[in-house]
Amino acid sequence: MTQKSKSSKVVTLILMILAMNTIYMLPYLMYTYYTPLQEAMGLIGRDADYGRLLNVYGIANVILYLPGGWVADKFDCKKLLIFSMVSTGVLGIWEATFPSYTILLLIHVLFAVTTVLTFWSSSVKCVNMLADDGEQGGMFGSLEAGRGVSGLVLTVMQQTQQIAQKL
């Protein structure tokens, strides 16, 4: 293996870490910005309706995990990853227009399509293809460690910003 291919693997792995951390932010923003989003969506005092958005997302995720493996095997994983990232971003923009509750439910089902059906299995397949047989354990370990560290860094940055705003 040449040095270039090792550096190419590292760059690809870093991009996968960033993609995996980023794509799941939109569906789960509701936890971080509970009250402001509830107000913006017109769901103040309707905690059950607000929670139902993530409930629908979770149920759709469970249903779509199995066919996600088939989709990842049937189509090019790089194209699926690009489709997933772009379409999740478009759904986030649509959600930012604060549409009706029915449309919000639809958006969360579509989030499941873009983050699980087309993204999750494809990302696992891409990382699997990135590593040789003897490297796969280390590659997946590095992927998960990188996701954890980058998630920690993002959380610390967010908390620091919130503390600074209160001062």
What is each model feature region?
Residues 37, 71, 157-161:
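Hydrophobic alpha-helical transmembrane and interfacial-helix anchor sites in secondary transporters
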Residues 86-100:
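C-terminal ends and interior cores of transmembrane alpha-helices
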